[in-house]
Regions:
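Hydrophobic helical membrane-anchoring modules
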Residues: 2-5, 210, 214-242, 246, ...
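Conserved class I S-adenosyl-L-methionine
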Residues: 2-52
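Class I SAM-dependent methyltransferase SAM/SAH-binding core
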Residues: 63-105
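Conserved donor nucleotide-binding strand/loop of the catalytic core
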Residues: 99, 283-318
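A conserved beta-strand element that flanks and buttresses the S-adenosyl-L-methionine
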Residues: 117
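A short glycine-rich, Lys/Arg-flanked "PGG" loop and its adjoining helix->strand segment in the class I
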Residues: 129-144
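Acceptor/aglycone-binding surface of glycosyltransferases and processive sugar-polymer synthases
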Residues: 154-169, 174, 303-318, 326, ...
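A conserved acidic beta->alpha catalytic loop
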Residues: 275-284
Length: 477
């Protein structure tokens, strides 16, 4: 394989040596498996959790293509510089495409992918930053790049395993730390989303260690594999359209303020009201204000199901905007704050903008003490489970792209219908899609009309069950 146009003489020698090495490893694997099968099967399990079937996937350093094939892509392209590896990959996985190419030069690839995988590849590269820079033209704005790479703590253990012929031989590695890779990603135009550790015991009978202990400190510090997910640094979106969805139940006295106080955002904006079996005249109040504000684009739907989550889903289904916003009808989150959420999403600061009530001091009656402590506990628990900081899980104001909500809804059966609020349905779904979640602090105000529709103790117990559920479905998998 020609490398003289990419590197100086030292780089060329490095590449030639590594190509010859991996060609030899490919031939060796025809009659030898070692003990690495347990490790690679666990890697495949992790990637199948991260990537749903039917995605467009590029794997760089694909070897014999087993990981790529296990993900059932709609379009699977594997790249490797070892001709011997690719010969075997094509024989094993005829439905996938395999191309001999160098990770440092992807100019021959002219299509974007949903996911790009570097599985135990990054530590074997001559110039990591250059390889990362090559990714820009094969990325869409929503592309996710997933890396897994050995921890430097395992250098001696892996060297011993190779000497005992239990693991495939490796040439000297870069032994990057997660911090090293984050820095290089930033230089290459990418933004890390989250990182974590996997696999304590890459041998038989490792289930408990690899699915439970590795999630806990201090055991996670000794894991074999570092994982990191990144996205392209975003470009601002110019003037998207906006739908503000308001679920209203027993909020008649707040409707006028919503019409009068909600600022205009985006190229076009609509208010989408979903009225939920009110005991007061909320529905009629919305109709009156719609008639009184003919210049506002607004629509009203009567909820057929029960609960806020059901109302929000109906509103999102009916919404026409590119951007979906939730505004609580009690206006305890001021409508005047919505442009901050809009701008954070439009500018690419995050893909799921989550309101936070717990940063600024609150009004005296805005949130009772037990509710405040409960929200603090739940935010800490869910931040740990999801791997991204979420300071307030039950602030009603959340903003995301409609296209991303469509993906959340399409994958909702993974979690099931468990959330009466709708907050966790969206948060879990966003985390499962590896969306960038960003907290946006707001000042939480006192109610000026009505009383809360939340039953503190009943819903608190439900949320405890949801923590256990989320831990099983997201953390300990």
């Amino acid at each position: 394989m020609e490398t003289k146009t990419l590197f100086d003489s030292a780089g060329q020698l490095y590449q030639q040596t590594h190509i010859a090495h991996w060609d030899a490893v490919a031939r060796k694997r025809d009659s030898w498996n070692g003990w690495g099968g347990h490790y690679h099967r666990r890697l495949a399990e992790i990637y199948r959790f991260l990537i749903t079937p039917g995605q467009r996937i590029l794997e760089i350093g694909c070897g014999q293509g087993d990981l790529l094939a296990s993900l059932r892509p709609s379009r699977g392209l594997g790249l490797d510089f070892s001709a011997s590896m690719l010969e075997r990959a094509r024989a094993k996985h005829a439905t996938l495409e395999f191309v001999q190419a160098d990770a440092h030069d992807l100019s021959s690839i002219e299509e974007p992918f949903d996911f790009i995988i570097f599985s135990d590849t990054i530590n074997d590269l001559w110039d990591v930053q250059r390889a990362l820079e090559q990714l820009r033209h094969v990325c869409a704005p929503s592309t996710r790049i997933i890396f897994n790479f050995y921890s430097g703590l395992w250098q001696l253990t892996l060297a011993l395993a190779q000497k005992l012929n239990l693991a495939a031989p490796m040439l000297p590695q870069n032994w990057l730390t997660p911090s090293d890779l984050r820095g290089m990603l930033n230089l290459a135009g990418f933004e890390p989303i989250r990182g974590w550790q996997e696999i304590l015991w890459p041998l038989p009978l490792g289930g408990f260690a690899n699915k439970f202990l590795v999630r806990l400190w201090p055991f996670n510090e000794f894991a074999l594999a570092n994982f990191l997910i990144a996205r392209p640094q975003p470009e601002p979106v110019k003037e998207p359209t906006v739908s503000v969805v308001i679920a209203a139940r027993n909020e008649s006295g707040n409707i006028k303020a919503i019409f009068e106080r909600t600022p205009k955002m985006g190229r076009e904006m609509e208010l989408v009201f979903v009225e939920g079996h009110s005991r007061d005249d909320t529905y009629a109040a919305i109709e009156r204000e719609m008639a009184a504000h003919p210049g506002s684009s607004s629509r009203l739907f009567r909820q057929t199901g029960i609960g806020k989550a059901d109302a929000i889903r109906l509103g999102f289904e009916k919404a026409k905007g590119d951007v979906l916003m939730i505004l609580d009808a009690d206006t305890t989150v001021p409508p005047e704050d919505l442009p901050r959420f809009y701008e954070a999403l439009r500018a690419g600061k995050g893909e799921f903008i989550n309101g936070v009530r717990l940063v600024y001091p609150m009004g005296k009656k805005a949130m009772q003490g037990l509710n405040f402590l409960g929200n603090k506990f739940f935010s800490m628990a869910f931040s740990w489970i999801l791997g991204q900081s979420i300071k307030d899980t039950l602030c009603g104001t959340k903003v995301l792209w409609k296209k991303d909500y469509g993906l959340i809804a399409a994958n909702r059966n993974y979690f099931g219908d468990f959330d009466p609020f709708g907050d966790y349905d969206l948060i879990f779904g966003a985390a499962k899609l590896n969306l960038k979640i960003v907290d946006l602090p707001i000042r939480y105000r006192e109610r000026t009309y009505g009383s809360t529709n939340i039953s503190r103790w009943k819903h608190g117990m439900l949320l405890l069950r949801m923590i256990a559920f989320a831990a099983r479905r997201i953390k300990f998998v």
